[in-house]
Amino acid sequence: MACQIWRWGNESLHFLPEKALWRETDRVLMVADLHLGKAEVFQANGVPMPSYGDAGTLNPLLDLCHAWQPKLLILLGDLIHARLGLTEALRDVLRALPVLCGCEMVLIGGNHDRDSWLEGLPQQPSQSLGDLWLSHIPETPPDPNQLNVCGHLHPVASVQSRSDRLRLPCFAFDPKGPRLVIPAFGQLTGGHDCGERYQQWLVADDAIVPWLASFPNKRGRQTA
């Protein structure tokens, strides 16, 4: 699968078509917005929805960890959808997840994780990683030279022709942040159009496709 390498200052980041971010320097894999247990939350509220959504999220995550062999997996918030969806079966899976992924895991707490306790996976606050400021919701980094990397927004881009219109997940860069928003990883997540102020890289099939590539960009730049 074709990834896109993007540089921010001294940081070299890989946009992966699996909707994940790879930091080669210390072999860190980042994903956001898995929203596990979402189907069970809908079912509890009387909305019929099949329960296989979590497998459609977790199996690709395990495949990704097997392929890239990260030393650390950072979950940028909203690991679960709501406490109501935290079944015992899901708790068992989450307890085993570090072993299944074969690496250490860190959860930066998101708004959907609030009030939920996950054994062995305490929620951590926003934090620095090199020149990056990692958070769930968009934040202003404490150091103006840092790049905020976050989730929460579930960014998608609209691609339109005369006869068709597609909405594709994307990596979205806002130079005014400066901020990089990564796409939602979960199978049962929607998306929000990130708008023209963002430079966008579309997740299209098994490739990353630069979009609006002429967007002004002071420090971030794409490389082949």
Q: What is each residue range found by the language model?
A:
Residues 1-76, 81-224:
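Extended recognition/assembly regions associated with phosphoester-bond processing machinery
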